[in-house]
Amino acid sequence: MTAGNPAADPQGAPAEILEHRLALVMNGGVSLAVWMGGVACEIDNVRRASNGIPPRDGATEQEKAVHELWARATQRAGVRVTVDVIAGTSAGGLNGVLLATAIARGASLAGLEELWHDSGQMSAEALFRPQQNGVLSLMNGDFFHDQIAGELRQMTPTPHGRDVSLIVTSTALGSSSREVRDSAGDSFWEADHRRRFHFSRHGARPCYREGDDGYQLHDGEPVDDLTDDETLAWAGRASASYPVAFAPVEETPLLRQRRVWPDWKTSDTPDWLADGGILDNSPFDPVLESIQRKPVTGPWKRTLCFVVPSGDEAALGRDITPPAGGGAGNQPPEPPPWTSVAAAAFGFPREANFRDDIDHLHRTIHHGRSSFDVSRFLLLTDNIPAASTEAAPAAEDPLTEARRICTAVLPLYRQSCTAAAIYQVRDTIVRSRPNGYIDPVSEITDPGFGNAAHPWRPGTFPAAGDPLPTAWKWGADAADRVVRTMLRATTSESARGLRSASSEAGLGDLRKDLSKRLHQIAAISQAIDEYLVSAGTDAASLDDPIVIGMLDNAYDALGAGTALASSVAGAAQAYAGGRLAAPARAPDVLAAALAVEVSNGAGSLPDDSPRPVFDFARFGLGNPPPLLQDAYNSAMTGPDGTPNDPNNILYGTRLNHFAAFADADWRDWDWMWGRMNALARLARLLGLNDDEVNDLTKAILAAEGRGLPAVQDGITTAMNYTGKEIRDHLRSADRFPPALDALFDLLRSDAPTNPPLRTEIHDLGQAVSDLLARSGHEGHVKHHVLRDAALIIRHPFWKHVEPDR
């Protein structure tokens, strides 16, 4: 833990609060939802407390104490927490829907713990409630939907609502493919069953549309997609439709309107939607894209939080002993048993999913150059005089030298940006089509592209004394990168602790102005893309001259150069006046930002999808608060000296992730542990000291009705609980009968299947039900003689299942 926050002054009172923005990617299935709910609860607690929002509705005195401790700790650290992007998959989709709705409406998660405690139970009154439309799955998904919708209806809007973006994933069943072609023109089919639904609450953003005086920027309308309880409930229910456990759901017309993936045109036929975790476990890309569009006003820092309730990837293959280097007589050693091989074969795909997620994040961070761009920009602008009356910079100051170098390499930059434009236009057009290319860009045929003028390609680098442009010749993507560099330069030093937040006091209006101009540029870019898609719909060819002509026409028809120049020049003026106190030096500010742009693009293609600057934090099952760390470390070794599976700390990881639904005490434990994991991770992110963390640990445990010694003992109990002990406990608590009743109901169900089951298989399911279903729950019996004769088998079977029978 750190002792404080570098933004604070010597007396411990920060001059300006650092906004710590969290983007959450929530991933987990079935009863792991309970742990994730605990994490969401604690994140919401610190969000509310640090922003001066009162404790959640109906908070107990113990919960109010937690709220007060969070408020004091974050105030001392000089930080407030914002959650502005949430992506949820499976059970993460459910919790993400509830958390995002609470944030957007200014409501609270007051009922979330009760929802999981009461509704997440495998009983005939809850998840195994009889299904009205026939037995379509083991559990009653309609019951689950009704509980979620009911919780959403309780979230009454208040003045504390905040802007937030929500992405929920699902998997489409049935046909979902398009015809694509390879580089030789041969066609084949590309399937994509991933579905993403986007909900957002944000203020009015600019739009670029045609009016009486041609295309102009206009103020858009505020957006709030998080008011429709039913559509939100269906999105959460669809994302968590674990195969066979819950029936898939139909994509409603309103839900279809929120679909943003696939990004190519699909049929208008609605889909059947199943669990998002089947194909799209961790949707990082839409989260990063959403981050790009978030406006800022104060100093900020961004953390991408991966909330995933599992560490089982590390345990995979642990039961296989490595070979000892050859057996006796140079014979190969005994291979692993087939059971271990089978377990590895089924388990290793989990490793692949998790590894791909981490590799993707690593590449994103590695390829990001935003911090370096800002450093170069600051180096060039630090020597700009602070008063407009001062003389121009000396001949070889950094900015003058940069102008000279950029002028020399501009031909290389022009080639790069032309190639990038051709690639991007082709990709934009092809991705919008229901058919396309697996390699839509092919090779650029002319490495030079001649010297013809184009409205999106610069002819010269701005010289000293040049005014701000009235027509922007650098393209929309470069405009975004240039203004984004200016915006990032207003906060990155305080966020990294290199400068106190007090040095950034008064920059709020500047950040707001630059954020607005980025939205203007995004609106113009969207209009350009829409023009290109329309123009390219019937294009027989997408060779270089045709693509360049399309782009020229788009800029001319839309007046994009003039509109972009207004936004970029306005950004440079705002930065020069607001940050440098030298409004007349706006052309030099723009030249400095363009120098960064040219130096990046002269040797490679400019990046058309800039990545935000962010830290990465994984919210997982390990790393509890310090007061619980020793007990956790000790429990990692079992009584016989063998290592325990770290996943055992949660009951929700047992019985194929269903166990927490079987026992209310287990759900309460998982919820509490989620709060503990969130506290430990948030404490490190926000710079809390040890005393603050210890006080919060004890306060949260008190709010959960638990004492510290009991929790320390509970860690040992959970980690050493064997599968047999879990099954014995569930049997003694009569948890198996409703599950078996549901299984037999499904086996004898007459619900249609696709493809239709063979008659022999259906009859076998009916026979198993007739043979073993308990009295009173046997449904329609077809094999009466078999059932009567099987009493001698059925009675001891149920005696074992129900010890008190």
Task: Kindly give the residue locations of the regions a language model identified.
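Active-site gating loop/helix substructures
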Residues: 165-296, 447-541, 548, 552, ...
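Charged, amphipathic alpha-helical linkers/stalks
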Residues: 302-307, 313-446, 690
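Acidic, Ser/Thr-rich low-complexity intrinsically disordered segments
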Residues: 318-321, 335, 349, 355, ...
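Patatin-like phospholipase
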Residues: 18, 23, 32-156, 172, ...
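Surface cap/lid and interfacial helix-loop subdomains adjacent to catalytic sites
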Residues: 107-165, 177-185, 193, 202-203, ...
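Long, C-terminal catalytic modules of enzymes
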Residues: 377-395, 654-686
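Extended hydrophobic secondary-structure segments that form protein cores and membrane-embedded regions
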Residues: 22-26, 83-90, 118-122, 164-171, ...
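Flexible, membrane-associating and regulatory peripheral segments of lipid-active enzymes
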Residues: 1-24, 45, 84, 591
